[in-house]
């Protein structure tokens, strides 16, 4: 049996990367992989993890010492492969230390954010570290094309994220799912600079709402600022922010549109998950992800144009038939992120 050690920053957070790590480790553990999920930060898993997966956490409190503990664990247990799932910083640290301390396992780097979001100096450092890995797995074809053309990397592969809600399609009929939709625009994510929800509120104040409401699900350092903006724009009756919930599926199930105004992404789980609930999508064309996820099931909007985003959101609100057409396409396209296809790609990479 293939022994796989997966390193992540934390398993107790509600972010998309944490969701991916939990879902992927559970999937692999049920398909002839002996999986250990090593979380640098302590805490109980926020998302479900299969009981076949062994969960390890360091005892140290300082990050550097936590990384040293991980390296020692990797050297002692000698897994066939070490997979680093990272938002950027962790992959650099873990790859450098793994080579410095001569970890013998195959090193597989999985970065969940576009390298183009970093400065030129950081890009060079990351590309150097990518060269230390046997394989580099990115989330989009755009990222692979950039790394192979700009830096001539040969060890780059593309594997998308698995939707944790893929079972919804087999359990329900599309017409029943669509019938449960309410007049709500849903946005999900951390209330941070990256997710750019302030811009969504700037847009929402100009939308012809026709009884629709905006629901933002998330927590973070910008919450007070966003609440103040809701008050400033007099949106108290049409916009609301609620804390993250493990029952996020209920929000997906009952909403009519999913919206995203992020400054940058990797391959946003929110847009992938929304497909399983037949949600039409509207998102800015940020790097990277929306343009590869949204096909014939929504709008990808020029990043510079709030006006176009507003106009196309108005179209979605005004036309139930348009929403139904997009919803049907999203329902069908969700198969692209099902476990069978993603598992095959990982089998090819790991074996």
From Swiss-Prot:
Keywords: Exopolysaccharide synthesis, Glycosyltransferase, Transferase, Virulence. GO terms for molecular function: glycosyltransferase activity. Gene3D superfamilies: Glycogen Phosphorylase B (3.40.50.2000). Pfam families: Glycos_transf_1. One of its GO terms (biological process) is polysaccharide biosynthetic process. The keyword Transferase applies. Its EC number is 2.4.-.-. It comes from the Bacteria. SUPFAM superfamilies: UDP-Glycosyltransferase/glycogen phosphorylase. Pathway: Glycan metabolism; exopolysaccharide biosynthesis. Belongs to the glycosyltransferase group 1 family. Glycosyltransferase 4 subfamily. Involved in the biosynthesis of amylovoran which functions as a virulence factor. May be involved in the formation of galactose alpha-1,6 linkages in amylovoran. This is Amylovoran biosynthesis glycosyltransferase AmsD. It comes from Erwinia amylovora (Fire blight bacteria).
């Amino acid at each position: 049996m293939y022994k796989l050690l997966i390193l992540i920053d934390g398993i107790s957070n509600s972010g998309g990367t944490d969701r991916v790590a939990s879902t992927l480790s559970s999937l692999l553990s049920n398909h002839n992989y002996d999986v250990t999920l090593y979380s640098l930060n302590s805490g109980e898993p926020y998302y479900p993890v299969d009981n076949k997966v062994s969960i390890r956490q360091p005892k140290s409190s300082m990050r550097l010492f936590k990384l040293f503990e991980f390296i020692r664990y990797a050297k002692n247990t000698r897994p066939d492969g070490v997979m680093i799932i990272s938002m950027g910083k962790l992959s650099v640290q873990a790859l450098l230390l793994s080579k410095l301390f001569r970890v013998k396992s195959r090193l597989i780097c999985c970065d969940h954010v576009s390298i183009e979001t970093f400065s030129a100096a950081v890009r060079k450092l990351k590309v150097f570290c990518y060269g230390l890995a046997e394989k580099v797995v990115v989330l989009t074809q755009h990222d692979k094309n950039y790394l192979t053309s700009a830096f001539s990397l040969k060890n780059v592969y593309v594997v998308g994220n698995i939707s944790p809600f893929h079972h919804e399609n087999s359990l329900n009929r599309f017409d029943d799912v669509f019938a449960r939709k309410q007049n709500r625009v849903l946005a999900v994510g951390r209330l941070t600079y990256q997710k750019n929800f302030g811009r969504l509120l700037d847009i929402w104040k100009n939308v012809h709402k026709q009884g629709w409401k905006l629901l933002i699900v998330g927590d973070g350092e910008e919450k007070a600022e966003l609440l103040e903006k809701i008050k400033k724009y007099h949106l108290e009756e049409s916009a609301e922010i609620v804390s993250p919930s493990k029952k996020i599926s209920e929000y997906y199930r009952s909403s009519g549109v999913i919206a995203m105004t992020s400054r940058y992404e990797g391959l946003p789980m929110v847009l992938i998950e929304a497909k399983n609930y037949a949600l039409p999508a509207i998102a800015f064309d940020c790097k990277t992800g929306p343009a590869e996820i949204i096909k014939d099931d929504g709008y990808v909007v020029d990043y510079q144009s709030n006006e176009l985003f507003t106009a196309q959101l108005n179209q979605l609100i005004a036309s139930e038939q348009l929403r139904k057409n997009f919803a049907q396409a999203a329902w069908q396209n969700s198969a692209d992120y099902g476990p069978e296809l993603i598992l095959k790609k990982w089998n090819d990479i790991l074996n």
